[in-house]
Amino acid sequence: AVIPLKNQGKCGSCWAFSTVTTVESINQIRTGNLISLSEQQLVDCSKKNHGCKGGYFDRAYQYIIANGGIDTEANYPYKAFQGPCRAAKKVVRIDGCKGVPQCNENALKNAVASQPSVVAIDASSKQFQHYKSGIFTGPCGTKLNHGVVIVGYGKDYWIVRNSWGRHWGEQGYTRMKRVGGCGL
């Protein structure tokens, strides 16, 4: 289960949205509670990342672990710009994170079968940016520059959740060709 789609706006915070989506989902799987968590807290407080200028999933997870948790979206709402880090509740905790070997489709498929998984893709092509529907087959390269979440898969494609709002793609999702598409 995932929270309704969100939109990162003009802030380069895909790393925070992708990380938070997986933590929300893992929390729902473990507790049965689907709670919208704060991307803004990561943008403001994950100092090893770069706020709206980009970041890394592993550093975001490490922030959540070291901080003892992350607050809700309601308590620490998204602003689409980096502000000062402020005190926040620790509503949902994680105790670790595990990577999936790059370019290993079976490992990724096994991970996605048990929970949504964050991945970096090459989203620089105009075709991806203006994607509307169908199985996205490219063109795209392997310059990993955008964080998304794989929430499922079909025979020939991954079901990928983006953070560009419901107007993009298939209600904010895309189906991406499996077998090495866009850096996967």
From Swiss-Prot:
Tissue specificity is:
Laticifer.
Q: How is the activity of this protein regulated?
A: Repressed by the active-site-directed cysteine protease inhibitor E64 (L-trans-epoxysuccinyl-leucylamide-(4-guanido)-butane) produced by Aspergillus japonicus.
Question: Which one GO biological process term can you cite for this protein?
Answer: proteolysis
| Localization per record | Secreted
InterPro entries in the cross-refs:
Papain-like_cys_pep_sf, Pept_cys_AS, Pept_his_AS, Peptidase_C1A, Peptidase_C1A_C, Peptidase_C1A_papain-like
- What are the annotated GO cellular component locations? extracellular region
Q: What Gene Ontology molecular function terms does this protein carry?
A: cysteine-type peptidase activity
PANTHER family attached to this UniProt entry: CYSTEINE PROTEASE FAMILY C1-RELATED
What protein is this chain from? Answer: Ervatamin-A
Query: What species is this protein from?
Result: Tabernaemontana divaricata
Taxonomic lineage is: Eukaryota, Viridiplantae, Streptophyta, Embryophyta, Tracheophyta
